[in-house]
Design a protein with these regions (language model features):
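C-terminal reverse transcriptase regions that engage the nucleic-acid substrate
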Residues: 1-70, 145
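Conserved helix-loop functional segments at active or binding sites
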Residues: 55-63, 106, 127-131
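Metal-dependent nuclease catalytic cores in nucleic-acid-processing enzymes
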Residues: 12-15, 115-136
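Hydrophobic beta-strand segments of well-ordered beta-sheets in folded domains
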Residues: 137-143
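A short, polar/acidic, helix/strand-boundary loop motif
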Residues: 91-120, 124, 144-145
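Flexible loop/turn segments at secondary-structure boundaries
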Residues: 15, 81-84, 93-94, 107-108
Length: 145
């Protein structure tokens, strides 16, 4: 069962930039894979999360292709060690999403005060955004913590 769950999370993880809040959704299932236990301890909560991830793959929102001539906007927040973000660009009067981002802070950073976790989250999200923007340096940061 662990092998199948790892495969499912790997496939889903490949599509994570199209799934808003992926990190929060998948966190419980990743925690079930930790340790040397043979059994997963599958319960109703795991089933709900699993089904939500399956549903998210089939109903992902439409994302736009980036225009490297325009400024990018990065919105994100950090809660309980998970950073969730959205990279987008203004298309007329509408902010159009390009990617949804999610990252876990490392164990050390999770213990920091809120203000320092926000700094660590900023560094993580900017690093992820640069991968998707091909290193274009015109990114407008909007930080929400």
């Amino acid at each position: 069962m662990k092998k199948q769950l790892r495969g499912f999370l790997g496939t889903n993880g490949f599509c994570r930039i199209w799934i808003p809040g992926y990190g929060n959704l998948a966190q419980l299932l990743y925690e079930k894979l930790r340790g040397k236990r043979k059994r997963l301890g599958w319960d109703e909560t795991c089933k709900v999360v699993f089904n939500a991830l399956k549903e998210s793959i089939t109903t992902a929102p439409a994302l736009s292709l980036p225009n490297l001539e325009k400024t990018f906007r990065l919105y994100f927040s950090e809660r309980i060690g998970t950073t969730l973000g959205m990279l987008g660009q203004m298309m007329g009067q509408v902010l159009q999403p390009m990617a949804y981002l999610s990252k876990q802070l490392d164990k050390m950073a999770r213990r920091w005060p809120t203000c320092l976790r926000a700094v660590a989250a900023t560094a993580l999200m900017v690093k992820e955004a640069f991968k998707l923007t091909l290193g274009v340096h015109r990114i407008s940061l909007n930080v929400y913590t």
